[in-house]
């Protein structure tokens, strides 16, 4: 008899990746393609951004740029990358300083502080450039600090090329035809998409952005409610050679689809997951995609959006439940 092998991980960072995929069954009326969701809320701290947080930190360590217990990691974030950095920083011994628009959800701020991060909030009207400028200002005043720069750091898409893409190919037994993913930094779509296109020359990649801020489609930056995508700029890490088409989704569509995922699929996801699902359903209804398999990335779980408009109606109901 083979000796039992211990499968206990050395630390929490070894739990990153290998997230499951599941078919959507109950919100796909009218779809001629199958849709499978890759559940990135199953990461240790509930988002896809933990992959790139680990990838960027390891890359900097390998290059001798940072040292645990000595270096400070500084980053501009809408929340989830910051949470990934804070979680890994806690596990490895790094101080983490983050800049974030004040409009991001309360849950994000609480989680970051609970993980020991230092958080600086900026005026949301200044957009992504506002948090980048603040991060650069902090970095300039702190020796032994580094900005990881997720929007342009090549280890971001490379992490998805090494992990997310191969996982999708493996777990679909090579049957996947289409990838749908929201565009924040562009890393998930570009890295995973490049790997999958190398495996299948006919593979298609669809990006998702808010209708209200459709910059990648040639529009102007605007205000929207889909936290994590639609940053109001074209990120350096977005590879247009990988991207086949951009699907626009309104904030209302994203929120309503996220609600349906909870009510009909039992999947409590964030607003950007709702946006990705709404886009995937649009693609799955196209006649040319009959019989194909679409994989859609669900970037984060719903718990960190409880204070947002996504759960406004049920939050009000919960606060007014009668005592019987």
UniProtKB/Swiss-Prot annotation:
Enzyme Commission number: 2.5.1.47, 4.4.1.9
Pathway: Amino-acid biosynthesis; L-cysteine biosynthesis; L-cysteine from L-serine: step 2/2
UniProt subcellular location: Cytoplasm
Keywords: Amino-acid biosynthesis, Cysteine biosynthesis, Cytoplasm, Lyase, Pyridoxal phosphate, Transferase
Superkingdom in the source lineage: Eukaryota
Coiled-coil residue spans: none
GO terms under cellular component: cytosol
Pfam (any one): PALP
Catalytic function, reaction form: O-acetyl-L-serine + hydrogen sulfide = L-cysteine + acetate; hydrogen cyanide + L-cysteine = 3-cyano-L-alanine + hydrogen sulfide + H(+)
Disrupted-gene phenotype: No visible phenotype.
Tissue and organ distribution: Mainly expressed in flowers.
Cofactor(s) for this UniProt protein: pyridoxal 5'-phosphate
UniProt-annotated binding residues for pyridoxal 5'-phosphate: 80, 184-188, 272
Family matches, as NCBIfam families: cysK (TIGR01139), cysKM (TIGR01136)
Described purpose of this protein according to its UniProt entry: Acts as a cysteine synthase. The cysteine synthesis reaction is more efficient than the cyanoalanine synthase activity.
Name by which UniProt lists this protein: Bifunctional L-3-cyanoalanine synthase/cysteine synthase D1
